Amino acid sequence: MFKRLSLYTLLLCLVPFFVWGFTYHWHGNNQLMEWDYWLYLLTETGSVPYALITCAIFALLFRFLFENRKQWIMGVIVMGLSVLSTQVIKTGLKTVFAEPRPFTVYLAEKTESTTDAFYHQDRSERAKLVDKFYSTQADTPAWLKAHYEDETGYSFPSGHSIFAATWLMLAVGFSQLLGNRSFKAELLIGAMTIWGVLMLISRVRLGMHYPIDLLIAIISAWAVHVIIFSFLQRKNIFSTNKEVDN
């Protein structure tokens, strides 16, 4: 269990490591390409309210991992607690560290203001400042400007990244806990990995986060799920004859 969760955590961590390795820094949208719109659509699967739909779809996709409906319902409860706990951790860390997002830093630089002044405003005023500034930026499309207006909170850590990492950890954790090594289970984990990696890339590419925001989000999700699945395994809550432990 621990090894498998750690392996997929490491795979996600490759994204911020590669960003650092290639010294990529977001500084405006002058390098934005057409395919970035597809990254935006993907990143929206982790945005409120669409994230709720994503959760419902994923919970249904996980159904085949469980032996019966009762076991699946218990699993859905664990999924809900997992998503809720990681989002609470994310919110707490954002409040404590209060780090500005890349696109707000860029706004402050170009308007000769400060991020402190920006975040001193309430969210509605921040959205107006974002709209006013990015409306003058020809390289920022309307869909991205609207996304910025909706995401004027703090940067560290990434909520979308912890959301994506959480669902990957759930897929890996439940497949291990229930001993489901079927092709469908491996396909689910593979799809969740690709979705998660693209989610992480989108957050940096669209000017929403720094690599450290992604890294801490991933590690936080890993730590939470090591605790969750260790507890479930120890208490034998999901009893099954196919359980594996590695």
Predicted features, each with a name:
Residues 77-86, 90, 217, 221, ...:
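Alpha-helical transmembrane segments in multi-pass membrane proteins
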Residues 23, 59, 89-98, 102, ...:
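Membrane-water interface at transmembrane helix exits
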Residues 2-6, 126-246:
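Membrane-embedded catalytic cores of phosphoryl/pyrophosphoryl-handling enzymes
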Residues 13-21, 83-88, 194-204:
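Aromatic-anchored segments of alpha-helical transmembrane domains
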Residues 26-33, 67-69, 141-142, 181-182:
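Helix-boundary and loop/linker segments of multi-pass membrane transporters
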Residues 1-65, 74, 90-112:
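N-terminal transmembrane-helix/juxtamembrane module of multi-pass inner/ER membrane proteins
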Residues 68-79:
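Interfacial loop-to-transmembrane-helix boundary motif in multi-pass membrane proteins
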Residues 22-24, 104-147:
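Histidine-/acidic- and/or cysteine-rich, low-complexity loops and terminal segments associated
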